[in-house]
């Protein structure tokens, strides 16, 4: 017995199948060079296949052919939205292998600028996120604040983005006192005003909530299984923060809260980052209040360069300077893994030294890679426009992801 199927006037008798589209790598919401191959059933996402590696530059291999100091600028170019936090893991790993003391002032300066970097990074991410879901104005205000952060970086190191300011043994140069005063004033005036205005347009906005609430809900167990870290795992309600659980530099002296979410959706991830901006401001204020006077780099002449004045008067200082910038310092054989709380999550550096002046191996543990691999898991069953909100909430930068 044959069943007669009436031919559909719309499909002309064809069987409707899922169709496959490319999202990126030229898509403005793809945040760089991400290509996602999506399988759609109408407008419902069935499968997402992220193709990464389009920004692969062989960083880990390049580092093996450079001295420890020459390898430092490569870290600025990993997550180029938060360069100082990339350097932080690397210099801490070298210091652990060298077993050297970092002066207190240098530690305070590092923590201060790491938190300023966190604010700068969140300004970019939160601004891009609201832009992705259709709000325009808040992004402009947050870019103003990011520009302020860039100006502070420039006044400290001479460069706006790729600072290379954290060095093994401390920081490269001391900051002018006026800069610290200006940062303190900025935290009390411009930051709360502009950021508060921007968030007042977004956080209680009905359209923004419709685009983010209950999108990409991830349970606590799943967040741990997928290897989430940073705001992604804190949004799931797990108060995991390396600055508290494994404090480095002077974070153990800082008083701050760990913002956590309850619903673990895109809105919670956004909210956690918003609260983190205020917590970072709290930490910076404590640094400004507690920061002592003193040296800003290790006194070991074999690791930190002498001042220019000493170099022009002392033969010994000149020799140290010459050796340091030609041959570099030798690091005793050993291996170490150091992770720091970057704005995007846990950024780790696994450094293997063989006793020479170059790293034998430097494995970089990126933050965004583990978040991006859950893209299929988070997007399934959602609509196509939700993918941009999910990607915005992940906060992915491909310099770091592809290495």
Curated annotation (Swiss-Prot):
EC number: 7.1.1.-
Chief localisation class: membrane
Major enzyme class: translocase
Keyword rRNA-binding among UniProt keywords: no
Catalysed reaction equations from the record: a quinone + NADH + 5 H(+)(in) = a quinol + NAD(+) + 4 H(+)(out)
Gene Ontology MF annotations: NAD binding; NADH:ubiquinone reductase (non-electrogenic) activity; quinone binding
UniProt cross-references to InterPro entries, sorted A to Z: NADH_Q_OxRdtase_suD, NADH_UbQ_OxRdtase_49kDa_CS, NDH1_su_D/H, NiFe-Hase_large
Keyword Membrane: yes
Gene Ontology cellular component list: plasma membrane
Keywords attached to this entry: Cell inner membrane, Cell membrane, Membrane, NAD, Quinone, Translocase, Transport, Ubiquinone
Membrane topology: Peripheral membrane protein
Subcellular localization, as worded in the UniProt entry: Cell inner membrane
Similarity comment: family membership: Belongs to the complex I 49 kDa subunit family.
UniProt function note: NDH-1 shuttles electrons from NADH, via FMN and iron-sulfur (Fe-S) centers, to quinones in the respiratory chain. The immediate electron acceptor for the enzyme in this species is believed to be ubiquinone. Couples the redox reaction to proton translocation (for every two electrons transferred, four hydrogen ions are translocated across the cytoplasmic membrane), and thus conserves the redox energy in a proton gradient.
Subunit structure: NDH-1 is composed of 14 different subunits. Subunits NuoB, C, D, E, F, and G constitute the peripheral sector of the complex.
NCBIfam families reported in the protein's UniProt record: NuoD, PRK06075.1
HAMAP family: NDH1_NuoD
Protein name from the UniProt record: NADH-quinone oxidoreductase subunit D
Species of the source: Erythrobacter litoralis (strain HTCC2594)
Taxonomic lineage: Bacteria, Pseudomonadati, Pseudomonadota, Alphaproteobacteria, Sphingomonadales
